[in-house]
């Protein structure tokens, strides 16, 4: 329809979209193909593509995303997960392929770099049904590998040009970007926390707090600091402009998003406030609902989850990331 608002990525229909950040344009130099409807085809950057069964009737969009992540991780378990907790391999996220029941395991930084739709918001889930039916009362234990010296944290603030809010600053100093011991969810939203959050001096510089934010300037103004990838988007803290220290969620499949949205638009109307502080945010996290775990297990046991064989799978990944899927 003439004058209708375009979905994110629509301008690239029938073409290829490249990340804005120069660092990512070099790493993923072939770009991501876009279908006639403006949805990205992640297959060339996938370590695995999984075909999922139809969604249960009446399931909400938040439940649908969590269910799909759980099911895909049962099909492609992470061999580095000592507890077999069902988490996604670090540095990777599950991306929905549009207009079908398939998900692709793709690099988290590439998925976050491109504004797009094509996920659960365009599927059969009920958009009016939000939130998750959590059935536990305790937050996840925090895992980490190292602490940061106070001088290092001060240098981080100098590089970023902002004073980190106290709650998040303490988390960064104590864990250098820790992660939950098991996949965690927030009762009000449809994301899964199963990745290490951004830290410093990471082996992959796109997991580095400073480098990662340099690639997200089209997403966040200077009032916000991205602090990690989620299955379902990005986590950010507010660092300026009032309400400093609050934690926010950017949904990477938000149907309200438009192709011409700026970083200011994202901050004004596309972020979801999760908590007053990072400590409160972590305390609100819960284990994945047992009802969704059961649905994923039944689908696997019934043979309704299959690995898709496609010669294009992973064909555009950098050589260092083309190892077989875990």
Tell me the role of every PLM-derived stretch.
Residues 1-93, 97-138:
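Nuclease and nuclease-like effector domains acting on nucleic acids or nucleotide cofactors
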Residues 53, 108, 228-230, 239-240, ...:
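Structured loops at beta-to-helix junctions and adjacent beta-edge loops in soluble globular domains
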Residues 57-59, 102, 233-236, 254-264:
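Short, surface-exposed beta-strand/loop "edge" segments at domain boundaries and coil↔beta transitions
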Residues 87-89, 99-101, 220-222, 230-232, ...:
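Short, well-ordered loop/turn elements at secondary-structure boundaries
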Residues 95, 234-240:
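Short, surface-exposed beta-strand/loop micro-motifs that present aromatic residues
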Residues 133-234, 315, 319-325:
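A surface-exposed partner-binding patch
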Residues 248-288:
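Compact, glycine/acidic-enriched structural inserts
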Residues 298-326:
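Charge-dense, low-complexity intrinsically disordered regions
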